[in-house]
Design a protein with these regions (language model features):
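Short, conserved beta-strand/beta-arch hydrophobic-aromatic motifs that form part
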Residues: 45, 58-114
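Cys/His-rich microdomains that often coordinate metals
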Residues: 16
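Residues immediately within or flanking Cys/His clusters that coordinate Zn2+
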Residues: 4-6, 19-22
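Well-ordered alpha/beta subsegment
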Residues: 2, 107-162
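A short, surface-exposed helix-loop junction/capping segment
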Residues: 21-37
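Amphipathic alpha-helical segments
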Residues: 38-55, 129
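Short cysteine-rich clusters marking metal-coordination/redox-active sites
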Residues: 9-12
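Acidic, Ser/Thr-rich low-complexity intrinsically disordered segments
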Residues: 156-176
Length: 176
């Protein structure tokens, strides 16, 4: 059985599935992001509860990420009146609720959703987060039946270099 231990950054203590993964060591307290405003804190707390169990919260200067084995969801620095949450799946979801969907080769899709009220964290979002949490557990690595969409639909945002590689017939996961 392969070693499934996580690498721990010796500077900040954050953990990762691979050695020396790019990250920010500018670790902050959660209050540095959410401040004293009870409205966004209530939305954040409901989002964390919807993640379905204990997760590691990695709070850095520009974002907060949620992790089981790998990072599977998070929020950008809060806006004045809303949170911009994201979650990772191995398939794209087409929904008017989503602000954007970005493709990351070979088969990851980062979905972004605006959360302004506690009610925005509803059953639909909770179901997406449950699937995303399984990606965080790396079920897609061990389950051969797990769906992996390697060709992004035209409505998904694709980085220019990745789109060029796809157009040439190259492996887009080799683009750095």
């Amino acid at each position: 059985m392969p070693d499934r231990s996580l690498w721990r950054c010796p500077t900040c203590g954050q953990t990762f599935v691979a050695v020396n993964m790019p990250h920010s060591c500018a670790v902050r307290p959660i209050e540095a992001h959410l401040g004293d405003g009870p409205e966004l804190r209530a939305v954040y707390d409901r989002l964390v509860a919807a993640l379905g169990g204990p997760v590691t919260e990695n709070v850095t200067k520009s974002r907060i990420t949620f992790q089981t084995r790998m990072r599977f969801a998070g929020i950008d620095s809060p806006r004045r009146d809303h949170l911009l949450a994201n979650f990772v799946l191995t398939r794209p979801i087409d929904s008017p609720r989503l602000a954007s969907v970005d493709y990351i080769p070979p088969y990851y899709y980062v979905h972004r959703v605006r959360l302004a009220r506690e009610d925005d964290v509803d059953g639909e979002l909770t179901a997406w987060l449950a699937e995303s949490r399984q990606v965080g557990d790396q079920r897609h690595v061990t389950d051969p039946e797990w769906p992996k969409v390697r060709q992004p639909p035209e409505w998904v945002r694709v980085p220019r270099q990745v789109a060029a590689a796809i157009a040439r017939g190259d492996d887009p996961s080799r683009v750095r």
